[in-house]
């Protein structure tokens, strides 16, 4: 079963588990799955949990790009990056993703939590699903292009939050 979360959410006991398949099997397995994470959700037939996992991941990447835009707009106007990150990570947009990955724009982790390759794989799957299901995914498509740019800049082994660096370079800030 796919999970949503990170090393931190696992340590905090807040991992979310999505399960697809037969309902009877889910009902029997749920107590064991709750040892992995407290939020265990039956989502439907086989494969449906994977669809939701991809939906979660595309939302993470799109949020990271939007957060990056906000930080860089503030920074280019003269507000320090640190102040922008502090305000945004404690504002109405402060989702768990923003709270955990927002500080990455100040210092990337030594080891990627979810690297560019892994995120781009899910973005491409989402875009293909969108085409198949006639669901336009415009922000997913744009965010995917930033992941492609990260690959071109040699940042592929970095956490996908490195899309901030891509946008920063395009904005005349950074390396």
Locate predicted features.
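Rossmann-fold dinucleotide-binding core
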Residues: 1-58
């Amino acid at each position: 079963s796919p999970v949503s979360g990170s090393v931190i959410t696992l340590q905090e006991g807040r991992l979310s588990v999505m399960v697809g398949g037969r309902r009877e099997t889910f009902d029997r397995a749920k107590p064991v799955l709750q040892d992995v994470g407290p939020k265990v959700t039956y989502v439907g037939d086989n494969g449906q949990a994977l669809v939701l996992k991809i939906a979660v991941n595309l939302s993470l990447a799109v949020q990271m790009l939007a957060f990056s835009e906000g930080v860089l707009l503030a920074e280019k106007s003269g507000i320090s990056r640190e102040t922008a990150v502090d305000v945004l990570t404690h504002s109405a947009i402060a989702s768990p993703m923003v709270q955990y990955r927002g500080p990455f724009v100040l210092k990337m982790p030594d080891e990627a939590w979810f690297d560019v390759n892994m995120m781009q794989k899910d973005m491409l799957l989402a875009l293909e699903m969108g085409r198949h299901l006639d669901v336009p995914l415009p922000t997913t498509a744009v965010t995917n292009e930033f992941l492609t740019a990260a690959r071109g800049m040699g940042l592929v082994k970095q956490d996908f939050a490195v899309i901030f660096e891509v946008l920063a370079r395009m904005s005349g800030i950074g390396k």
